[in-house]
């Protein structure tokens, strides 16, 4: 009887070990942001302070779902994110996802440019496995720090079989948004990210992850060069004289995104500046400052979307300026620069 109990105990231990070994592996790429900040007692303001390992230690329950590998890529505010850092992040994510044992990737990031990084990764990383970005609206010194919950939810999303082939997602406040449409809508509220007309694609509940829909518009654009072409965003507003756009072209910008009005409209000085850029073979993409809706070549007055399109500009479709800039950069570094080819890519 003693022998039987001993054998049973050993068998149970072996079974538990085997179960632990079969837990999915998730790589956690930490880049910084409010989620990695604490209050500095001298400055009396949040500053970068904690690593990915420190954040992981606040979520002991995460081990029930996955084995987490931490890769501390940086610890910077997301305001410091730029194309070189995006290239580094894409390479790290792709390397992790190419490993058969890795189920997916979590990226912690500041919320200010989180939507840009999400879209960049969605365009430049090729895998059926999920990438889930998280951030926090409260720093780690706050009593209501939202970072640990977002990290736990991200792990649950990554290991859920339903999450395959959904591209890059953003998980905060129990909601799941897709990279293409998500945007930050509030400076301080924890429910800051949403996807406008299209809504979030799923939610995280205590018992399971539920998806309501899946992203439909996705494309892959390889990174061909380490250095991205310079693309500037120029804002249209009442009384704009177009000089900022002309100056950007004269300084060597390789592409321009105009944050236009309405469906893609602008005044005559800005329209003339667009034509100036096009005369210098600098592609111009017209987006809008309006949160929802598409840009269309609809209006025929001088500076209306129809006349600007007829002059050679590209309509950004439903991409807002920051994301239109990212797509234009990647297309240009792949040698795609004609109006027809650019328009086809923006329409995908």
List PLM regions with ranges.
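Internal gly/pro-rich beta-alpha loop/helix module
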Residues: 134-205
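Short, acidic/small-residue loops that bind anionic groups at enzyme active sites
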Residues: 118-149, 156-159, 279-288
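ATP/NTP phosphate-donor binding region
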Residues: 21-94, 292, 315
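Accessory alpha-helical/coil subdomains and C-terminal extensions
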Residues: 23-24, 29, 51, 57-62, ...
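ATP/nucleoside-binding phosphotransfer catalytic cores, i.e., glycine-rich phosphate-binding loops
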Residues: 268-348
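A glycine- and small-aliphatic-rich helix-loop capping segment at beta-alpha/alpha-beta transitions
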Residues: 42-51, 113, 119-132, 147-153, ...
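N-terminal signal peptide c-region/cleavage motif recognized by signal peptidases
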Residues: 15-16
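Short Gly/Thr/Asp-enriched flexible loops that form oxyanion-binding sites at enzyme active sites
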Residues: 107-129, 266-275
């Amino acid at each position: 009887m003693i022998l039987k109990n001993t054998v049973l105990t050993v068998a149970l231990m072996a079974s538990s070990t085997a179960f632990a070994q079969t837990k999915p592996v998730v790589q956690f790429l930490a880049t910084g942001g409010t989620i990695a900040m604490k209050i500095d007692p001298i400055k009396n303001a949040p500053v970068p302070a904690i690593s990915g390992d420190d954040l992981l230690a606040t979520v002991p329950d995460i081990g029930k779902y996955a084995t987490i590998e931490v890769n501390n890529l940086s610890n910077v505010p997301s305001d410091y994110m730029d194309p070189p850092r995006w290239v580094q992040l894409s390479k790290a994510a792709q390397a992790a996802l190419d490993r058969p044992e890795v189920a997916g990737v979590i990226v912690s990031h500041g919320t200010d440019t989180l939507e840009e990084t999400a879209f960049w990764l969605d365009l430049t990383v090729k895998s059926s496995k999920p990438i889930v970005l998280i951030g926090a609206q409260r720093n780690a010194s706050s009593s209501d720090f939202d970072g640990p919950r977002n990290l736990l939810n991200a792990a649950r999303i990554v290991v859920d079989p339903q999450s395959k082939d959904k591209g890059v997602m953003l998980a905060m406040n129990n909601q799941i948004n897709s990279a293409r449409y998500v945007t930050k809508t509030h400076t301080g509220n924890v429910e800051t990210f949403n996807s406008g007309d299209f809504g979030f694609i799923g939610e995280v509940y205590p018992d399971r992850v539920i998806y309501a829909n899946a992203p439909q518009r996705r494309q892959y654009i390889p990174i061909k060069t380490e250095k991205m072409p310079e693309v500037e965003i120029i804002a249209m507003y009442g009384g704009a004289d177009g000089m900022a756009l002309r100056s950007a072209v004269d300084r060597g910008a390789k592409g321009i995104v105009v944050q236009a009005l309405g469906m893609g409209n602008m005044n005559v000085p800005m329209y003339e500046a667009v034509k100036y850029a096009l005369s210098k073979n600098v592609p111009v993409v017209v987006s809008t400052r309006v949160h929802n809706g598409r840009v269309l070549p609809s209006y025929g007055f001088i500076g209306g979307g129809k006349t600007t399109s007829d002059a050679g500009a590209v309509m950004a479709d439903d991409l807002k300026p920051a994301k239109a800039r990212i797509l234009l950069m990647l297309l240009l570094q792949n040698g795609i620069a004609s109006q027809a080819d650019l328009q086809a890519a923006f329409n995908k």
